[in-house]
Amino acid sequence: MIYAGILAGGIGSRMGNVPLPKQFLDIDNKPILIHTIEKFILVSEFNEIIIATPAQWISHTQDILKKYNITDQRVKVVAGGTDRNETIMNIIDHIRNVNGINNDDVIVTHDAVRPFLTQRIIKENIEVAAKYGAVDTVIEAIDTIVMSKDKQNIHSIPVRNEMYQGQTPQSFNIKLLQDSYRALSSEQKEILSDACKIIVESGHAVKLVRGELYNIKVTTPYDLKVANAIIQGDIADD
């Protein structure tokens, strides 16, 4: 089976003084989360589309789904965890409790606050994860990347044509991800905040799918302005 895991567990601290977590803020008069869910509903391959949100915001999430007529029976809401990977594991726990987990099950995990992903990106994630077990969505780095250990001096400049910026979705064979996460120590779980990094550390290859420049993550007030400009300018190509 194929599942979507929508990660809506953030509280939006970088958004500043706002009354709601960032996933519930509006762009073009509609919550960011709803824009994102609408993209996933269009993909018939998904057996379930599972939104993980802070426990105290579950009722609000269910209310806005009703308000915006998200009636697709595949959409479920569960409580997120204390961090990104724990949230993904909560989604997997839901899957295991409801349907069990089969060897070829795939989960497509995606930031709720990336509302501009395309059908191509979603479907390529499904195809590549089903074939290879793990995939990340990336774009080539445009700017030169510099590294600094002391935040004052450059200690390394990586080769730019080997650098990519990670986006989401990140998609996995569920058993591979679950087994790789369970093998981590408590210390590793605190350090390895990215699911693809967990797979890399396990020794399994992670394939790449091409993202889009406009597949932005809306985390700051500036991002919110850019997101509205993308919609109003019809920049995102689906």
Swiss-Prot record:
The keyword Cell wall biogenesis/degradation applies. The record marks R160, K217 as: Positions ribitol 5-phosphate for the nucleophilic attack. CTP binds at L7, A8, G9, G10, G81, T82, D83, R84, N85, E86, T87. InterPro entries: IspD/TarI (IPR034683), IspD/TarI_cytidylyltransf_bact (IPR050088), ISPD_synthase_CS (IPR018294), Nucleotide-diphossugar_trans (IPR029044), TarI (IPR034709). GO terms for biological process: cell wall organization; isoprenoid biosynthetic process; poly(ribitol phosphate) teichoic acid biosynthetic process. GO terms for molecular function: 2-C-methyl-D-erythritol 4-phosphate cytidylyltransferase activity; D-ribitol-5-phosphate cytidylyltransferase activity. The keyword Plastid does not apply. The record marks R14, K22 as: Transition state stabilizer. Keywords: Cell wall biogenesis/degradation, Nucleotidyltransferase, Teichoic acid biosynthesis, Transferase. It comes from the Bacteria. It holds the Pfam family IspD. Pathway: Cell wall biogenesis; poly(ribitol phosphate) teichoic acid biosynthesis. It catalyses: D-ribitol 5-phosphate + CTP + H(+) = CDP-L-ribitol + diphosphate. It is an enzyme of class 2 (transferase). Its EC number is 2.7.7.40. Catalyzes the transfer of the cytidylyl group of CTP to D-ribitol 5-phosphate. Belongs to the IspD/TarI cytidylyltransferase family. TarI subfamily. NCBIfam families: PRK00155.1-3 (NF001183), PRK13385.1 (NF009924). HAMAP family: TarI. Heterodimer together with TarJ. This is Ribitol-5-phosphate cytidylyltransferase 2.
